[in-house]
Amino acid sequence: MAAPEAPVKYVGICKDSAAFKLMKSMGWEEGEGLGKDKQGIKGYVRVTNKQDTSGVGLDKPNPWAFDTTQFDNILKKLKVQAAPTKTSKNDDDSDKEDESEDDAVKSEPAKLKTVAKVTRPQGRYKRREKGKLVNSYSSKDLEGILVKRTEDPSPAVCDIADSMDIEIISEDQDASIKEQKIEEPSSNWWGFKSGFVSGGLLGAKSGKKKLKASERKMFSENDQENLYNMVQDKATAGKQGLGIKDRPKKIAGVRYEGKKTSFDNSDDDDDDDDDDDEEDEEEDEDESEADDDDKDSVIESSLPAKRKHDEIIEPKIKLKNLCKQIVKKDAGKGGFMKLKQLKSLIDEQAPSVLSEFSSRKDAIAYLKLKLERSGKFVVEGKKISLVSSKK
């Protein structure tokens, strides 16, 4: 036994529901109204599409592809005559006899009746594709469709070509041919209305045209490039206020003015400066003042520009001033001292000065070379002494 069809949702009344059975048990029958006097609604609540909230001028979509009822009605109205089918041989013989009798009776030839064939979508599409084929078109029709350009130039182009005298120079021609001036196109040229400038025909020798003072100069690509470069070069010229350039630079909210000084840490750079300045200083200095200055100038401390986190700042020691102080204090008779003795005293007082040398011989050679370059010391073989200030 086939199962009953399931009720469609939201359409009609579900008679198998508990509510319908409860109403039946209470004395209500289908088709009667609700209420005490049965004056209420008799049918079920029908669900409708609520459209009362749509605004004025709402365009409802027209799903024409899903509604084909009109097309079906048109097809039904069409008269379709089906071709006769052959049932048996006897029917065919009888038909032939009838036709022969009719032909004998009728003297005039009967007009053949055209039978309308059933329309099919394949036939419609075939006709469309057949209409797109170009094989059956004539040459004139093809020229009208494909718009082939004719070899004869248009009258507008002819006017421009006739009015312009352009010289096309090739390598085979003689070099003695004079250049002809390129005349401007006619005033009826369409390019003037759009702001174009004629550049000549292909192969013509380019040359600058002299514009008259009364004529208007056109804006070219070079002018655009020059204008861009001029604006970019002077882009920062107007960002500062009046008088700002003449005032000193502002650092941390204060106008800073001063001299820039640099500190040199190498001994070699100091040698050249000492040789020039020491000769002038020795003429004006006394011996008493020289002793005090030497003691103060042995150790000089200078703060570096930037210091690392774990870096220890050590005092800077000048080798020449230290040697001068040692020779004055510990020199023997005649004011002479040996280089070995001077080197050992330097290691005692400032061991870091000559610590770069691995051997003692290299350190003594460097010390001798350093003192020979200075004008304060006199080096005679392995002995050293100070230059006397008395002349």
UniProtKB/Swiss-Prot annotation:
SMART domains: G_patch. The keyword Glycoprotein does not apply. It comes from the Eukaryota. Keywords: Nucleus, Ribosome biogenesis, rRNA processing. It is found in: Nucleus; Nucleus, Nucleolus. Residues 80-132, 212-307 are annotated as: Disordered. Its main location: nucleus. InterPro entries: G_patch_dom, PINX1. Residues 92-102, 265-295 have a biased composition (Acidic residues). Disruption phenotype: Reduced leaf cell number associated with pointed leaves shape. Defects in pre-rRNA processing characterized by an increased accumulation of rRNA intermediates containing 50-ETS, ITS1, or ITS2. Higher levels of 35S, 27SA, 27SB, P-A3, and 18SA3 rRNAs. The double mutant gdp1 oli2 exhibit strong growth defect due to a synergistically impaired cell proliferation in leaves and enlarged cells. GO terms for cellular component: nucleolus. This is G-patch domain-containing protein 1. It comes from Arabidopsis thaliana. The lineage of its organism: Eukaryota, Viridiplantae, Streptophyta, Embryophyta, Tracheophyta. The gene is GDP1.
